[in-house]
Amino acid sequence: MNRIALYTGSFDPLTNGHLDVITSAASICDELVVGIGAHPSKAPLFSVDERAALIDRSCRDFLKERSCRLSVQPFFGLAVEAARAAGARILIRGLRNGSDFDYEAQMAGMNAAMAPEIRTVFFVASPGVGHITATLVRQIAAMGGDVSHFVPQPVLRALEAKSKTDG
């Protein structure tokens, strides 16, 4: 049986916290679809195409070692509809703290009501990454701070390149 899971987020940028969830998800599925939420009204740091390339470069090799195929695609609208379109029966969510759990448990309940065939699986953040958020990474990087402990190398290089062109 081909187990397909969908992990959605903005991934702007991809962080080591996201990688932690992706690594955990790879242990329970044969194919992981990373769905990049595309919101036309928001002004992201990286375009959807840039984020997709960064996710691919950051994840492809280590997922191959785990026999998990990776695909990255944008999605608009509801995560359960994106899961259905991808053939996924599992939604992956990461939890950093109790606040995340409260929100994600409500979302899982709503998703189950809309799509009972799709299950939500939660992965609790590893101790070393529970404090990382993409918002804080963007803010620290914008102020010239060192984010090397918070993002994978391809993302770090992209942030550095962006700061040179924007600064």
Swiss-Prot record:
Residue positions binding ATP: S10, F11, H18, G94, L95, R96, E104, V129, G130, H131, I132, T133, A134, T135
GO CC aspect terms: cytoplasm
Reaction equations catalysed: (R)-4'-phosphopantetheine + ATP + H(+) = 3'-dephospho-CoA + diphosphate
EC nos: 2.7.7.3
Pathway listed: Cofactor biosynthesis; coenzyme A biosynthesis; CoA from (R)-pantothenate: step 4/5
Subcellular location: Cytoplasm
Protein keywords: ATP-binding, Coenzyme A biosynthesis, Cytoplasm, Magnesium, Nucleotide-binding, Nucleotidyltransferase, Transferase
Signal peptide: none
Single GO biological process annotation from the record: coenzyme A biosynthetic process
Residue pairs linked by disulfide bridges in the UniProt entry: none
Residues the record marks as site: Transition state stabilizer: H18
List of residues binding substrate: S10, K42, A79, R93
Cofactor(s) this protein requires: Mg(2+)
Superkingdom: Bacteria
Class in the EC hierarchy, top level: transferase
Molecular function GO terms recorded: ATP binding; pantetheine-phosphate adenylyltransferase activity
InterPro entries per the UniProt record, alphabetical: Cyt_trans-like, PPAT, Rossmann-like_a/b/a_fold
Function: Reversibly transfers an adenylyl group from ATP to 4'-phosphopantetheine, yielding dephospho-CoA (dPCoA) and pyrophosphate.
Subunit structure as annotated in this protein's UniProt entry: Homohexamer.
Similarity comment: family membership: Belongs to the bacterial CoaD family.
Record HAMAP family: PPAT_bact
Protein's name in the database: Phosphopantetheine adenylyltransferase
Source organism of the structure: Methylocella silvestris (strain DSM 15510 / CIP 108128 / LMG 27833 / NCIMB 13906 / BL2)
Gene name in the database record: coaD
